[in-house]
Amino acid sequence: MGKDKNPRRVADNEAMAKVRMLRTSPQKLNLVAQMIRGKKVDKALTDLTFSNKRIAQDVKKCLQSAIANAENNHNLDVDELIVAEAWVGKNLTMKRGRPRARGRFGKILKPFAEITIKVRQVEEQA
């Protein structure tokens, strides 16, 4: 097992960022991810800033990280970036319990999720 010998490659006009162990369910996180897919990054940042969802601030940090990676590591123009992909995955589930009637035990599941955001530079059409 272990780490792959070849890390994941991204195209020359792409950059990505990933956040793991977000304390929300993947279903709730996917609602926020759908909100930003395909948008220009400045519009996506504005939408996340004014979103009422609690997890939107964590997604905003991930998007800002992807933008910084594009600018610093890949020398891409920030004004021409769009959110090319934003996909959500399931992470571990914390298991907790609660005593119930007649000596039983109720299971409480506390899910975690992860999100990966890929930004791509597109040329402005005249």
Curated annotation (Swiss-Prot):
CDD domains noted in UniProt: Ribosomal_L22
GO CC annotation: cytosolic large ribosomal subunit
Job of this protein: This protein binds specifically to 23S rRNA; its binding is stimulated by other ribosomal proteins, e.g. L4, L17, and L20. It is important during the early stages of 50S assembly. It makes multiple contacts with different domains of the 23S rRNA in the assembled 50S subunit and ribosome. The globular domain of the protein is located near the polypeptide exit tunnel on the outside of the subunit, while an extended beta-hairpin is found that lines the wall of the exit tunnel in the center of the 70S ribosome.
NCBIfam families: rplV_bact (TIGR01044)
PANTHER family attached to this UniProt entry: CHLOROPLAST 50S RIBOSOMAL PROTEIN L22-RELATED (PTHR13501), LARGE RIBOSOMAL SUBUNIT PROTEIN UL22M (PTHR13501:SF8)
Gene3D superfamilies per record: Ribosomal protein L22/L17 (3.90.470.10)
Keywords: Ribonucleoprotein, Ribosomal protein, RNA-binding, rRNA-binding
Sequence similarity: Belongs to the universal ribosomal protein uL22 family.
Domain of life the protein comes from: Bacteria
GO MF: rRNA binding; structural constituent of ribosome
Protein name from the UniProt record: Large ribosomal subunit protein uL22
One of the GO biological process terms: translation
Organism: Ruegeria sp. (strain TM1040)
Oligomer status and interactors: Part of the 50S ribosomal subunit.
Alphabetized InterPro entries for the sequence: Ribosomal_uL22, Ribosomal_uL22_bac/chlpt-type, Ribosomal_uL22_bac/org-type, Ribosomal_uL22_sf
